[in-house]
Amino acid sequence: NLFREDDGDYSIYATGHGDLPEALRESGLLRRFLADRGGGYVWMTNLDNLGATVDPAMLGWMAENEAPLMVEVVDKVGTDRGGVPVRWNDKRIIAEEFRLPLSLDANAIRVFNTNTFLCDAARLENLIFDFTFVEVEKQVQGRKAVQFERLLGEITVGIEPVFMRVPREGVASRFLPVKDNDELARRRPEIEAIARAR
């Protein structure tokens, strides 16, 4: 059954960020970006990461080295969880911790994916890859709901990445996730300092 809100309407939720490559392709935006605007790179990040911006030095490095995909990673702090860089079938990929073998201690991997990607637009346009749907349990209006999401880190299976370790502290921070208004208010001085430094 589809989940319904208390008022009987179907519950609407944001899709997983893994829908973005297909949406850019299927909408024609990516094709027009390449053909009509001469676009070369697509920058993708989570909306809640207020530290992420397009960095000209990173973009220049990508162009000079003809790297198809750059994934930003940061040092883990506390209970950080998320996709981690690993080798799988002799390829570098981002693997979500729940997909790692039980014998592998995810805490031994000291960095994780910030969900900030810089990708060669032509490679993204030509990517033929079916992202996996992941079952995610959530609480909605006090009731258990299951939603299906696709995760952008899986793009690394289809496009070979380079991993860029970026700072998460101080005015150079590129990872500043803010999940709600209370956290936004609490971290406002830090956000303002980062914005002024850029």
Would you name each region that the model predicts?
Residues 1-39:
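Conserved N-terminal catalytic core of the sugar/cofactor nucleotidyltransferase
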Residues 30-46, 51-55, 60-198:
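Catalytic core of tubulin tyrosine ligase-like
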